[in-house]
Amino acid sequence: TVANLDSIATLLRCSGVDIVALQEADGPSFWSGNFNHVDYLADNGAFSQSVQGMHVNGLGLSYGTALMANLALRDPKAITFDPSLSPVPKGFTVSTVSWPGSPGTDVDIVSVHLDFASKSIRRQQADELIEAVRRRGRPVIIMGDFNTGWEENSTVQHISRALSLTAYSPEEAGLETFPTFGERLDWILVSPGLSFRSYHVLPDPVSDHRSVIAEVVLEDTAKATRLD
């Protein structure tokens, strides 16, 4: 509803984040009320830039992953995972940003949504993501709904190991993002040379998942960017 979008926009404005990653972000469709929810959030959340990938299109539905930012989003790309893997398509959106205060330092930002039902499908989707990140060849921050926790051999561990990424205190209690089952399904992963200055799961019930806000530092300059 518009009221819920307004609540999200208010939360984003108050948080002061530089970059936002969205999953199940609606475009214009019968289901969404025939307007683009990402454009609405960008306008009302005070973000100058947005990119969106529609991974589901049809039957009155149009939604996918998206990024919003107050930094220039360059070299954008949206990839829908192999549709033969799952009846409900998932995918990711990626763009490049220049790190604030550090000219010449480019970082890829990814918003990803993995399958909710099957570990084997998540693993295959993860391999598509890993290959795409490697091809782009930049440091990366991956944010999104991985639909899995940090258990041994989970998909989020697989991605982290394959790309040498770090998660914030992956086994710490109190960072659950899916309160219905008390699970941590939403993650932020960062490349070497980047580190977390702060990390919070917000209590605001703006969706069935809780929002995550992190402040990420470029280690050699201590220049920080706030992410949601």
Question: For each predicted feature, which ranges?
Answer:
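N-terminal, active-site-proximal structural segment of metallo-dependent hydrolase catalytic domains
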Residues: T1-N44, N57-L59, D127, L218-D228
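Sec-exported extracytoplasmic/periplasmic mature domains
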Residues: R13-V17, A42-F47, L73, E131-R138, ...
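Active-site metal-binding loops of divalent metal-dependent hydrolases
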Residues: A25, V112-L114, G144-F146
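Active site of divalent-metal-dependent phosphoester/diester hydrolases
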Residues: S29-N34, Q49-A69, S86-V88, N147-I213
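Beta-strand-turn-beta hairpins that frame and shape the catalytic cleft
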Residues: L61-Y63, A69-D75, P87-S111, L194, ...
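His/acidic metal-ligating clusters that form di-metal
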Residues: G91-V110, S120-G144, W150-I159
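Surface polyanion/phosphate-binding segment centered on an Asp-His-Pro turn
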Residues: I142-M143, G149, S211-D228
